[in-house]
């Protein structure tokens, strides 16, 4: 049975881990890094994922997609998304189904597809390490993700060729990694401030039992927002000095974003940094190049982002209230996410909870490690661990007057099932429409609509008489199913909620096929690159041999080799390059080069040079007068023995 892997699908970076014996292990990617940038880029020739995509972002801003986790499961007209769109160098479009999609190289991609490319990279990383195919995974999501976002993440896994055994909340995963070997009873708070989202979760850990008491958060608060504060500050300062608006230039905007991220990281360990971006623009009047050189202090950064940090404290207070606890009841605060390295964040968390946060976990890797532990639990490799999570938001339906009637309250332990009986609003009503919502507002329209369905053929009856039983069922992934049953006739209608505009089964199947086709194309491209490298190396070494020893060989042999090399060079040219053709050309040059070697040795033998070392022998031999390397080494050893 192949390993089940744990994946932290992050806004900024992603990470993959497995259970290695009794402990989770983070796997390094092909570039040797333990985390992979959650970036996908499209060029004329290929699709890039991770560090290669990040490296070319400045020169290809229109087609480099980042931070897609903030788009997943969201509508195009989402109010939170509106403020982000203007700061993104790539196009966010209406996917036709009302969802926010992205566009690159004139192709439309759903956020689930882009996420699938990142998950595919994580899958490849694990397969390369394990030496076997991986088909199953546990994937993490922010605790405050709604049903649509969870379903879209699960869809991404399917598109990537993974069976998603479990969707697990990121803070809960972090708690698993933190508390795996802890036997004592503890109440902990996990403060998770990542690249794009914020969560806080209160858990009780008791000898292998991990019980979530409450969770809260903001799916549009994270490091990306901190970066944009710096970007806007830099752009404003530059505009004051030079009168040029850098935010209108996509390439300059991408350079500012990279510089902002770098400066933010540097200011976690130093009090001041210099942001230096030469030739970032041009003076419109003189045509002279303009350079951006700005000093940024830690104090200035803290003033720019102070309200963002303060905003993260509101969910902390709400989570404590929902759990029925005070800050003094928390035994340990666990920090998760790269933003928790910022000194001001640590200071505010310490002030709020009244204690120094725990620093024994790696905030970038702990979530993936927790996902691997959950994978181990599902696979049976990890014993005596029980995880009880909660639903982050209340679930209910719209009733008469547009009121939101809750069936399942937030922070209810999942999986769970709840039923309630409703009736008709009019006489002789023969159908009801069940509209399902998720949220905390009193009016249904103010909450997130997850979907709707109809229960038809209700027998005519006075209003209030029919008995319609509505049942909500939330599975361990936090994904919702809803059914409605007419108790009089037994007629039932049931759906697994698919957000209006979410991907249909047909969409997913098409994307799975596209991913498989791309995987084959990627494999062919890799084979072509490897064949090209081998061919170029062979051409170089063979031409050098001709240059060094060509005078020892008859012209017809040299001519045959040069013809083979010319044919191989022709095979390497431009668009017509083909791996199989190149391999055939490599074979032809190799065979021709063998004749060169034979001719060289034959010429040496005829000249009586077989007893004398060749140039290659002189380089390798231990001294003059030795017939070959083996004898020379043997004689040296023999001398040493004496």
Curated annotation (Swiss-Prot):
Record PROSITE patterns: HSP70_1, HSP70_2, HSP70_3
Pfam families the UniProt entry points to: HSP70
Alphabetized UniProt keyword annotations: ATP-binding, Chaperone, Nucleotide-binding, Phosphoprotein, Stress response
Region (Disordered): 603-642
Entries under SUPFAM superfamilies matching the protein: Actin-like ATPase domain, Heat shock protein 70kD (HSP70), C-terminal subdomain, Heat shock protein 70kD (HSP70), peptide-binding domain
GO MF assignments: ATP binding; ATP-dependent protein folding chaperone; unfolded protein binding
Upregulating conditions: By stress conditions e.g. heat shock.
Positions with biased composition (Acidic residues): 608-642
Domain of life: Bacteria
Keyword tRNA processing: no
Phosphothreonine: modified positions: 197
Residues in coiled coil: none
Protein family per UniProt: Belongs to the heat shock protein 70 family.
Function of the protein: Acts as a chaperone.
Annotated PANTHER family: HEAT SHOCK PROTEIN 70KDA
Protein's name according to its UniProt entry: Chaperone protein DnaK
Organism: Ruegeria sp. (strain TM1040) (Silicibacter sp.)
């Amino acid at each position: 049975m192949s390993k089940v892997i744990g994946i932290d699908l992050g806004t900024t970076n992603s990470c993959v881990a497995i259970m290695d014996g009794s402990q989770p292990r983070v796997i390094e990617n092909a570039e040797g890094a333990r985390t992979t940038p959650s970036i996908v880029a499209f060029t004329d020739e290929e699709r890039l994922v991770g560090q290669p995509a990040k490296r070319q972002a400045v020169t290809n801003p229109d087609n480099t997609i980042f931070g897609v986790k903030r788009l997943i499961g969201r509508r195009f007209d989402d109010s939170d998304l509106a403020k982000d769109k203007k700061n993104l160098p790539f196009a966010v479009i209406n996917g036709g189904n009302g969802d926010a999609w992205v566009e690159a190289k004139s192709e439309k991609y759903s956020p689930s597809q882009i996420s699938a490319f990142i998950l595919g990279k994580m899958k490849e990383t694990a397969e390369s390490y394990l030496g076997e195919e991986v088909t199953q995974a546990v994937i993490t999501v922010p605790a405050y993700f709604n049903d649509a976002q969870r379903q879209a993440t699960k869809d991404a896994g399917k598109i990537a060729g993974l069976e998603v055994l479990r969707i697990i909340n990121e803070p809960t995963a972090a708690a698993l990694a933190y508390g795996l070997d802890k036997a004592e009873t503890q109440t902990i708070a996990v403060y998770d401030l990542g690249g794009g989202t914020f969560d806080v979760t209160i858990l009780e850990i008791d000898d292998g039992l991990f019980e979530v008491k409450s969770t809260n958060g903001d799916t549009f608060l994270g490091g990306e927002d901190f970066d944009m504060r710096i970007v806007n500050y830099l752009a404003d300062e530059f505009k004051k000095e030079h009168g040029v608006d850098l935010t209108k230039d996509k390439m300059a905007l991408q350079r500012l974003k990279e510089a902002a991220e770098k400066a933010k990281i540097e200011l976690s360990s130093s009090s001041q940094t210099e942001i230096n971006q030469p030739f970032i623009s041009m003076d419109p009047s003189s045509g002279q190049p303009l350079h951006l050189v700005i000093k940024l202090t830690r104090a200035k950064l803290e003033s720019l982002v102070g309200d963002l940090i303060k905003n993260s404290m509101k969910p902390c207070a709400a989570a404590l209230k929902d759990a029925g606890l005070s800050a003094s009841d928390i035994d340990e605060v666990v920090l998760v996410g790269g933003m928790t390295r910022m000194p001001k964040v640590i200071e505010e968390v310490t002030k709020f909870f009244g204690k120094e946060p725990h620093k024994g976990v790696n905030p970038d890797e702990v979530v993936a490690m927790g996902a691997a532990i959950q994978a181990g639990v599902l696979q049976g490799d990890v014993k005596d661990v029980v995880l009880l999570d909660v639903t982050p938001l209340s679930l209910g339906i719209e009733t008469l007057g547009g009121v939101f009637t809750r069936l399942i309250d937030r922070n209810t332990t999942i999986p769970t099932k709840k039923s309630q009986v409703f009736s008709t609003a009019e006489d002789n009503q023969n159908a009801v429409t069940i509209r399902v919502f998720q949220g905390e507002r009193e009016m249904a329209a103010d909450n997130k609509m997850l979907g709707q369905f109809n229960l038809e053929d209700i027998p005519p009856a006075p209003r209030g008489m029919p008995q319609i039983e509505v049942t909500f069922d939330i599975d361990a992934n936090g994904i919702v199913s809803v059914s409605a049953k007419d108790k009089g006739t037994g007629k039932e209608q049931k759906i697994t909620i698919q957000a209006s505009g979410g991907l249909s089964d047909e969409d997913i199947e098409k994307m799975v096929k596209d991913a498989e086709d791309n995987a084959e194309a990627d494999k062919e491209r890799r084979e072509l690159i490897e064949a090209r490298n081998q061919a170029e190396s062979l051409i170089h070494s063979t031409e050098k041999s001709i240059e060094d020893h060509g005078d020892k060989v008859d012209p017809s042999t040299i001519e045959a080799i040069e013809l083979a090399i010319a044919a191989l060079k022709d095979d390497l040219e431009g668009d017509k390059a083909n791996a199989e053709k190149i391999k055939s050309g490599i074979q032809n040059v190799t065979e021709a080069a063998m004749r060169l070697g034979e001719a060289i040795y034959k010429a040496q033998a005829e000249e009586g040079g077989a007893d004398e070392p060749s140039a290659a022998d002189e380089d390798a031999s231990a001294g003059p007068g030795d017939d070959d390397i083996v004898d020379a080494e043997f004689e040296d050893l023999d001398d040493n023995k004496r």
